[in-house]
C-alpha cells in the first residue's frame, strides 16, 4: 500500500482499493453518514507541545521508527504514525488501554463494554473512553469516575500496575511480536474495544525509568 500524503491538512491515499464514501469534490459534501451513540465517557486531552518536547528530548521518533521497520506493524498504521508522530501515538494509545484495564480492575467495568476513540493528528492529541447506552456500566458510573480525586487515583494505579507484567521480562523486552512491550496481561484489551486491533502499544512510553512520559509519577 502506498504511503498516505498530507494535502491541505487531510490524509490522502493513492490506492485503487481505498475509495471515499462519496463522489465528486470533497468541498461540495455537506452531509456524511454517521451513527449517533448515546452513552457516557471520559475524555483525556494531552499537551501537544509537551509531548513534542518529550519525544525530541529522548529521540523517540527514531527509536519507534526502528521498531516499525521490523515489519511487525501494519503499513497503513505505520504510515499514519510517520506523519503525525510515532511517540505520540504510542503514548496516547497505550494510555487509553491502561485506563480501560484499570477501570476493569478498580471499578468493575469489563473492557468489552468500553471503547476508545483516539483524537490523533498534527493538531489533536486526546482519547475518549466511552460506553454505549445499554452496555454494562452505562448508568452514570463512568462519569462518576471522572471526579478529580477519583480519576487521579485511577491514573496513578494504572501506571503502577503497568510497571510490571506477569509475562516480564519477555513482555518488556519483546521486539519481535505484534506489539513492543505489551501483551494481554498488561495492555491489550478486547479487539471490539480497540480502534487499531491492539497494534501500537508500548508500556515503556509511559513508565520506562529512563524515558517514560509519566516516570516521575510512579
Predicted segments, located by residue:
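Extended, well-ordered protein cores
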Residues: 1-218
Amino acid at each position: 500500500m502506498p504511503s498516505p500524503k498530507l494535502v491541505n491538512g487531510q490524509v490522502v491515499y493513492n490506492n485503487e482499493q481505498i475509495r471515499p464514501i462519496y463522489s465528486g469534490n470533497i468541498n461540495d459534501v455537506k452531509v456524511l453518514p454517521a451513527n449517533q451513540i448515546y452513552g457516557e465517557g471520559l475524555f483525556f486531552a494531552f499537551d501537544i507541545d509537551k509531548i513534542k518536547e518529550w519525544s525530541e528530548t529522548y529521540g523517540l521518533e527514531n527509536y519507534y521508527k526502528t521498531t516499525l521497520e521490523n515489519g511487525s506493524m501494519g503499513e497503513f498504521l505505520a504510515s499514519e504514525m510517520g506523519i503525525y508522530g510515532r511517540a505520540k501515538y504510542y503514548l496516547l494509545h497505550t494510555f487509553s488501554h491502561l485506563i480501560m484495564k484499570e477501570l476493569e480492575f478498580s471499578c468493575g467495568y469489563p473492557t468489552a463494554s468500553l471503547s476508545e476513540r483516539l483524537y490523533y493528528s498534527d493538531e489533536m492529541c486526546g482519547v475518549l473512553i466511552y460506553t454505549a447506552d445499554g452496555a454494562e456500566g452505562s448508568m452514570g458510573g463512568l462519569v462518576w469516575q471522572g471526579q478529580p480525586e477519583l480519576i487521579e487515583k485511577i491514573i496513578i494505579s494504572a501506571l503502577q500496575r503497568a510497571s510490571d507484567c506477569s509475562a516480564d521480562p519477555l513482555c518488556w523486552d519483546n521486539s519481535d511480536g505484534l506489539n513492543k512491550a505489551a501483551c494481554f496481561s498488561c495492555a491489550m484489551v478486547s479487539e471490539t474495544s480497540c480502534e487499531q486491533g491492539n497494534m501500537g502499544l508500548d508500556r515503556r512510553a509511559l513508565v520506562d525509568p529512563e524515558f517514560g512520559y509519566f516516570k516521575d509519577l510512579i
